[in-house]
Amino acid sequence: EMPLAVSLDGEWAFHYAENLTAPFSDWDTLTVPGFIQMQSLQKPGQPYGAPHYVNTQYPWDGHEKLHPGQIPQDYNPIGEYQRSFTLPESWASCYLRLNGADSAAAVWCNGVYIGYTEDTFTPAEFDMTAAVHPGENTLTVQVYRFSSGSWLEDQDFWRMSGLFRSVELFTKPEIHLEDVVVKQDFAPDFSSATVTFDCKVSGAGTISVVFDGEEQSAEVGEPAEYDSGVVFGKGEADPDVEEDVQDVSFTFTVEHPTLWSAEQPNLYETEIALLREGALVERTGLKVGLRRF
C-alpha cells in the first residue's frame, strides 16, 4: 500500500449552532465518520438534535414557507468540526476528500477558505496545497443540515447531518491516474469482446495496463510537448492542455470471453501502473465484468 493518503477519521473538536446567526455551543468532541444526531442521542439532553423522519414531506414543511432552492433560516443547524494534522514531509501537494457530508459543507485550512460542496452522497475533493505549510495545520469543516441540494434529496429516509463517511488527506505524485472509464463491445455472436480503458493521467512518465494477461503501455509527457492524437506504443495519448491532464486509451481483444452474470459473476483482473523514470509510483487494481445489458 502506497503512502499517498492519510486518514483523518477519529475524534474531532466540535461545536454547534441552530442557524447562521445563533451563537455556537462550547467545544465538544464527536467521532468521524458519524452522524451528528446519532451521537447527540448518547449525550445528556440531546444537545445537537435528533434524527428526523419524513417520507413525502420536506423537513421544513409547516415550519417555514420556502420556494424550491431556498433554505430554512430559523432552523438550519450548523456543526463545525475542527482538528489539526501534520503534513507529511514528502508531500508536494495536499488534497482533502470528504467521502460523505450531509447535506453541505464548507472547508477552511489554517483560516483560508478552501471551498464548498453540497451533494450528500458524492465524495468531494479540495486542493489545499496553497494553504498548508510544513508542520501542524488546522482544518475546519462546517456542515449544514439543509442546503439547496436538500430539495433533491426528498426520499423516504431519516434526515440527519454530519461527516458520516471517512475523511482523508491525499497527495498526487508526479504522475497520477485521475480517472479511468472502461468501455466494452462484442461480436454479434459474443465470440469476442473489445475492451477499452480510457485513462486520464496527470504528470509525465509511463502508464501500463495489464488486462487478461496482456500488457500495453504508453509514454505520457507534459501536455505542451505533444500534439493531440500522438500514439505511443499501443496506447494513444490525447493531451488536454487546459486541465493539464492527458487522455490515454488502451484497447484489448478477448476471444471467447467469460461473461458476467448474477449467477456467475466472472471478473477479469486488471492492473494499471504508473512509473516515473522506471520506478513504480502508483498502482491501481480493477475487476472488470464483461456483459451486454
Model region roles, listed by residue range:
Residues H15-A17, K43, P51, I71-E178, ...:
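Accessory beta-strand-rich segments of carbohydrate-active enzymes
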Residues A92, V132-E136, V254-L267:
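Short glycine/proline/serine/threonine-rich loop/turn segments at secondary-structure transition edges
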Residues E271-F293:
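N-terminal carbohydrate-binding accessory modules
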